[in-house]
Amino acid sequence: MSRRRRVYEGKAKVLYEGPEPGTLIQHFKDDATAFDAQKRATIEGKGVLNNRISEFIFTRLNEIGVPTHFIRALNMREQLIREVEIIPCEVVVRNVAAGSLSKRLGIDEGTVLPRSIIEFYYKNDELHDPMVSEEHITAFGWATPQEIDDMMALALRINDFLTGLFLGIGIRLVDFKVEFGRLYEGEMVRVVLADEISPDCCRLWDTRTNDKMDKDRFRRDMGGLIEAYSEVARRLGILFENEPKRSGPKLVK
């Protein structure tokens, strides 16, 4: 097997050179991180679950006309994607108060928000991904006003789709984080959904019990992360050829 050229490695994924120009292979790792990677562990099977869940969601989004970087699945851990220029701003959509919003504004966790709220965060681990305004984004040239409009419109479409998808399987979509990129097609440039959508970047609560089914289980030392992610996959109807072996986190020194 020929050795692939590594293009980029992040906290949870590795990007390799793809088979065709303008493509990449996105590989999902078993690494779990929280608090800007100050907390780390390796959780066996997490990468497989995130890959399969994200692949499922991106496929459905493509089908309803939401532009994404996803092309097709390759194997249990990898997918073929289009190469995009990542816009350095994370987009967070909140439906229910939780996490930093609850702390920042003193709103009880679990409070349903009057409407879905969109927030922007500058992607920079050293600065702890600070929250920024549209003014910051345009002033520093991270994105144009039109690109911001596109990201917000796509984020709300994704929110509508995911809210219905998860509600149908007994899961409440509390909030989620997405990233967007610029896809260059000849002289045309368009904003598309990139990165992933998985329990790593969504807050998912069981509608009946309010049990957390996302990465908060790792952040808050609750345990049972693989079991929770597996339950999300099962409810989505994703079948595994070989279900990931359940194991506890292995702390990385």
Swiss-Prot record:
Catalysed reaction, written as an equation: 5-amino-1-(5-phospho-D-ribosyl)imidazole-4-carboxylate + L-aspartate + ATP = (2S)-2-[5-amino-1-(5-phospho-beta-D-ribosyl)imidazole-4-carboxamido]succinate + ADP + phosphate + 2 H(+)
Entry keyword Methyltransferase: no
Record organism: Parvibaculum lavamentivorans (strain DS-1 / DSM 13023 / NCIMB 13966)
PANTHER family: MULTIFUNCTIONAL PROTEIN ADE2, SI:DKEY-6E2.2
Keywords tagged on the record: ATP-binding, Ligase, Nucleotide-binding, Purine biosynthesis
InterPro entries documented for this protein: SAICAR_synt/ADE2_N, SAICAR_synt_PurC, SAICAR_synth, SAICAR_synthetase
GO BP terms in the entry: 'de novo' IMP biosynthetic process; cobalamin biosynthetic process
Superkingdom assignment: Bacteria
EC number: 6.3.2.6
Pathway(s) of this molecule: Purine metabolism; IMP biosynthesis via de novo pathway; 5-amino-1-(5-phospho-D-ribosyl)imidazole-4-carboxamide from 5-amino-1-(5-phospho-D-ribosyl)imidazole-4-carboxylate: step 1/2
Protein name: Phosphoribosylaminoimidazole-succinocarboxamide synthase
GO cellular component: cytosol
Catalytic class of the enzyme: ligase
Pfam families assigned: SAICAR_synt
GO molecular function: ATP binding; phosphoribosylaminoimidazolesuccinocarboxamide synthase activity
Family: Belongs to the SAICAR synthetase family.
